[in-house]
Amino acid sequence: MRFGVEFGASVPQAQRITDRANVQSYAARLSRVTWHPISVSGAKANFHVLFMGEDDRAQMLTRVQQIVPNINPASMQILRDIPQSIHCLVIAFSATGNSSDYRESIALIRAEHPELLRKSCIHEELAQGLGLANDSPRARPSIFNDDDEFSLLTTHDEMLLRILYDPRLRPGMSLRQAHPIIRQIAEELTGGRS
C-alpha cells in the first residue's frame, strides 16, 4: 500500500507540512499493526489522500478523474455534490470482477477543518480504505462506527486490521471459510479472552 498525499491550491504550506507528517506517522503505525508494507510515496501511489478545500472542488474533481479515468457516475456525483456536513470520505475501487479486492482508494479530507478533525479523518478514512469499510454500531470501542465517540484508531481497531491482513485470510473468502480462521486469530490476539 502506497499513500500519495496531495493538496489543493488553497491549502497553506504550514498546514501541508502538518498533514503530510500526520499521514506519514499513521502509515508507519498501520504498517506495524497489519504487518503489511504501507508507506507514503508520491510514485505509484494506490491510495490517494487528497486534502482539498471547498475552493479546490474543481481541482479535486479533475484529479479524481485522472486517478480513476473510468470512475462510475454515482461516485463522481457523490464527490461533485458532497454536503458540507461530510468532513471526509473514502472511496475504494475494486479489481475487476472482485469487489473484495481493493486496487485503488481515494480519501478526501476537507482542508478547511481544524487540525484535530483532519487528523481524525486521516485515522478513520485511511483505515476504512484498507478494507474495513462498513460502519457498525456494534464495533466498540472503534472508529468504525458512526457515533463519533472515538476519533482516533483504538486498540480494538488495530486488532480488527490485524485480523483483516492476517495471511491466513484471502480476499473473496466466504464467511463460512473465514469464520473459523477469524475466531482463531482473535483468540491469539486476546489470549483466548472473548
Descriptions of predicted regions:
Residues 1-8, 38-60, 146-147:
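Acidic helix-start/capping segments at beta-turn-to-alpha-helix junctions
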Residues 1-23:
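N-terminal Sec/ER secretory leader and immediately downstream segment
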